[in-house]
């Protein structure tokens, strides 16, 4: 193949990658826009479902990387703990727990107490599971890798819910002009624009491949 043909094929490949990234961004942002800005019950459910989906994908990826590095972990226990943690925070902050179980109005302090309680139970569950693990791997590595996945993925994703539901918590001053949906939308737009901008600029003038074949 001649050099011009090779260069043309390379440019087509870059254009195809950029088109796929742009298309996925448009689809994702359309769903996120509706979830964050439409309001109502459907909006709350959509945001919760998206965050939980990210949570499950993130946990699977995290524990997959731990496995690739041949480190011990309780994958399914960690996945269960992460889903329970984020799910409980969603039910509490969305007001569904208060509606179903007659609890007090949601607050950030209450969410923090809930997280601490769930993490404490999760830690006990890991220690109990470790007792029955045969052959027994190092306790610190096994327990630490499992807990780290929940903290790094699920606990941090919980802050998305705290921002989104902040206006419904008891700490929010009456009449405060704060909309968690718009704040999250701003963060997402900045992140995606930075990602696409960096990719486009690197493709046009970059000299060194970040991930060479």
Model-derived regions, located:
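Membrane-embedded alpha-helical bundles of polytopic integral membrane proteins
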Residues: 2-213
């Amino acid at each position: 193949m001649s050099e011009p043909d090779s260069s043309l094929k390379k440019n087509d490949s870059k254009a195809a990658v950029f088109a796929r990234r742009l298309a996925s961004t448009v689809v994702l942002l359309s769903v996120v826009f509706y979830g964050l800005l439409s309001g109502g019950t459907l909006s709350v459910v959509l945001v919760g479902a998206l965050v939980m989906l990210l949570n499950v994908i993130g946990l699977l990826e995290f524990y997959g990387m731990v496995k690739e590095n041949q480190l011990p972990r309780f994958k399914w226990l960690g996945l269960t703990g992460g889903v329970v943690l984020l799910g409980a925070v969603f039910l509490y902050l969305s007001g569904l727990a208060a509606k179903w179980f007659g609890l007090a109005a949601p607050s950030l302090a209450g969410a923090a107490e809930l997280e601490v309680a769930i993490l404490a139970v999760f830690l006990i569950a890991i220690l109990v599971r470790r007792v029955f693990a045969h052959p027994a791997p190092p306790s610190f590595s096994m327990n630490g890798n499992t807990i780290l996945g929940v903290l790094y993925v699920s606990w941090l994703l919980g802050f998305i819910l705290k921002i989104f539901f902040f206006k419904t918590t008891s700490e929010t001053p009456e009449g405060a002009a704060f909309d968690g949906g718009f704040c999250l939308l701003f963060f997402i737009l900045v992140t995606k624009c930075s990602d696409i901008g960096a990719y486009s600029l690197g493709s046009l003038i970059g000299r060194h491949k970040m991930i060479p074949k």
